[in-house]
From Swiss-Prot:
InterPro entries in the cross-refs: Rbsml_bL25/Gln-tRNA_synth_N, Ribosomal_bL25/Gln-tRNA_synth, Ribosomal_bL25_b-dom, Ribosomal_bL25_C, Ribosomal_bL25_long, Ribosomal_L25_dom, Ribosomal_uL5_bac-type
PANTHER family, alphabetized: RIBOSOMAL PROTEIN L25/GLN-TRNA SYNTHETASE, ANTI-CODON-BINDING DOMAIN-CONTAINING PROTEIN (PTHR33284), RIBOSOMAL PROTEIN L25_GLN-TRNA SYNTHETASE, ANTI-CODON-BINDING DOMAIN-CONTAINING PROTEIN (PTHR33284:SF1)
Protein name (record): Large ribosomal subunit protein bL25
Keyword vocabulary terms for this entry: Ribonucleoprotein, Ribosomal protein, RNA-binding, rRNA-binding
HAMAP family cross-referenced by the UniProt entry: Ribosomal_bL25_CTC
Assembly behavior: Part of the 50S ribosomal subunit; part of the 5S rRNA/L5/L18/L25 subcomplex. Contacts the 5S rRNA. Binds to the 5S rRNA independently of L5 and L18.
GO BP annotations listed: translation
Cited function: This is one of the proteins that binds to the 5S RNA in the ribosome where it forms part of the central protuberance.
Origin organism lineage: Bacteria, Pseudomonadati, Pseudomonadota, Alphaproteobacteria, Rickettsiales
Pfam family, one: Ribosomal_TL5_C
Organism whose genome encodes this protein: Orientia tsutsugamushi (strain Boryong)
């Protein structure tokens, strides 16, 4: 499990676009804590403080202790909205987590390792990542930083499916009916075709 991060916030009673804009002018980020069966809790935090946490590795899979006035909440980041130009954090949603031992759905990053030893990449292939995160059900006290995927023995043209991932004890994939592809090693010609398709689309958009 990741080391728990800490963050200080405040309850807020004014909602809506104008209120959110006023908070942002003060350097604060409006946010909401969600949990099934409870009324959403509206909070705000200092943008510079939550932005520091956002830049840390494995932010999405790290439990945060959020101190709001005289209350403490254990939360997981759910969604972050950034300004499209300034990348200022406009809004953040949290999920309230239960005590240790309870199960929690969490989005965990996939770390593709062994690229320097990959047979396919050594032969001129290119790692095409389809999924960078996987949805898991994990005990709150055993949420992994990431799920490692070794691609050392993956050859050109081979696909890596979700079933290949080795999950920590107690963690399970959120139910899925398909064994979907999370990455593949494509050859030079396939890579070139993708780049040419992208260039053609860019040219069409500019007309």
């Amino acid at each position: 499990m990741n080391e728990m991060l800490t963050l200080v916030g405040q309850l807020r009673s004014d909602f809506g676009t104008s209120s959110a804009r006023a908070l942002r002018r003060q350097g604060k980020v409006p946010g909401v804590i969600y949990k099934k069966g409870i009324t959403p809790i509206h909070v705000c935090t200092l943008e510079k403080e939550v932005a520091k946490l956002y830049r840390k590795p494995f932010f999405s899979s790290t439990v945060i202790q959020l101190q709001v006035d005289d209350q403490r909440f254990k939360v997981l980041p759910k969604a972050v909205q950034l300004h499209p130009v300034t990348e200022f954090m406009n809004h953040i949603d949290f999920i309230l987590v239960e005590q240790n031992g309870s199960m929690q759905k969490v989005k965990v990053p996939i770390s593709f390792e062994g690229k320097e030893k990959s047979l396919g990449i050594k032969r001129g292939g290119y790692l095409n990542i389809v999924k960078r995160y996987v949805d898991l059900l994990c005990p709150v006290d055993k949420i992994p930083q990431c799920i490692k995927c070794d691609i050392a023995n993956v050859s050109v043209g081979a696909s890596i499916k979700i079933s290949r991932l080795e999950l920590p004890e107690g963690c399970n994939l959120v139910k899925s009916t398909t064994d979907y592809v999370i990455a593949s090693v494509i050859g030079k010609s396939s890579k070139q075709d993708k780049e040419e398709e992208g260039t053609a689309e860019d040219g069409a958009d500019s007309k």
